[in-house]
Swiss-Prot record:
It is found in: Mitochondrion. This is Elongation factor Ts, mitochondrial. HAMAP family: EF_Ts. SUPFAM superfamilies: Elongation factor Ts (EF-Ts), dimerisation domain. GO terms for cellular component: mitochondrion. It holds the Pfam family EF_TS. The keyword Chloroplast does not apply. Associates with the EF-Tu.GDP complex and induces the exchange of GDP to GTP. It remains bound to the aminoacyl-tRNA.EF-Tu.GTP complex up to the GTP hydrolysis stage on the ribosome. Keywords: Elongation factor, Mitochondrion, Protein biosynthesis, Transit peptide.
Length: 299
């Protein structure tokens, strides 16, 4: 029986010599190694194999070096997976909108992945919010409404990501130490799925009498400054009313719900808020300058 126990310990601990007690050297290092792996894993949520490799290469107790090694491994794996998945279809994900605190600038983006399972995760939704926040920060304000071309999009993806601390509290965005491009590669590394910024649109209220409204259907954890859903719209109106901001948001909601093919058709629709009135009646002397409506996975 004693021989069997020793044989069992020898097989379990590999090359560690067991003669009734564990090697002191092995025993002293094990708790520290496991602690390093646990800490790094909780910090990054990276795969266990990459975390373990990084800790072993850095050496026990050298967490700073392990973090650097892990970061490189994640990027390497993400790059390989991105190359393999580049021809795959990614139609799941979210329409994400972000508007500045003063309401003068807004961005709408479609962020895609391959499965609804990944889209529903908090890390992916947080990434979508960081992407919208970053483009809101960097996109130019020299046009009232424009679709973002691939060249400008790719240039901004190389910038450091801007992270919103708390949009509900209207706190300032703060810069992270990694680029959006790196953030997307990391997400691909973690999920094994293709992740992409499919399209972007920016609006700027360049005249004091104009206001931008946003609305998302099926929004998750929406706030006045950020909304994330399956269908989204942005609209810019011209109005002398002091309530122009509330009016623009109401029109954005009507656009999402009624899916008009043109502005003239939208104006003829009955309002969802007051069925006795058309959208034209709701607007009164105000006018719709431009609007955009997207559905996730659309063109």
């Amino acid at each position: 029986m004693l021989f069997q126990r020793r044989l069992h310990f020898h097989q379990f601990f590999g090359k560690t010599r067991v003669t009734g007690s564990l090697s002191r050297q092995w025993y002293s290092k094990l708790p520290s190694k496991l602690a390093d792996i646990k800490k790094l894993r909780s910090e990054t949520n990276a795969s266990m194999d990459l975390v373990k490799q990084s800790v072993e290469e850095a050496g026990v107790g050298n967490l700073e070096l392990a973090r650097e090694i892990l970061k490189k491994k994640i990027v390497q794996r993400g790059g390989k997976l991105a190359e393999k998945s580049k021809n795959r279809t990614a139609k799941e994900g979210w329409i994400i909108q972000c508007i500045s605190e003063d309401g003068r600038k807004a961005v709408m983006a479609e962020i895609n992945c391959e499965s609804d399972f990944v889209a529903q995760t908090t890390p992916f939704q947080d990434l979508a919010r960081r992407i919208a926040s970053t483009f809101l920060h960097y996109l130019p304000t020299n046009h009232s409404s424009y679709s973002v071309e691939a060249t400008l999009k790719n240039e901004i993806l190389k910038h450091q990501a801007y992270v919103s601390k708390n949009h509900e509290a209207n706190e300032k965005d703060v810069s992270s130490n990694v680029s959006l491009e790196e953030e997307i590669v990391k997400m691909t590394s973690f999920t094994g799925e293709k992740v992409q910024v499919q399209r972007l649109h920016c609006m700027n209220a360049r005249v004091p009498s104009t206001a931008i409204g946003i609305f998302s259907h099926g929004a998750k954890q929406s706030s006045p400054l950020q909304q994330l859903g399956r269908i989204g719209s942005m609209v810019q109106i011209n109005s002398d009313l002091s309530t122009r901001k509330g009016l623009s948001n109401q029109i954005a909601k009507e656009i999402v719900a009624q899916d008009p093919s043109s502005t003239s058709e939208l104006l003829s629709f009955r309002s969802l808020v007051d069925s006795e009135k058309t959208i034209k009646d709701v607007l009164g002397q105000s006018t719709i300058l431009e609007w955009v409506r997207w559905e996730r996975g659309g063109n």
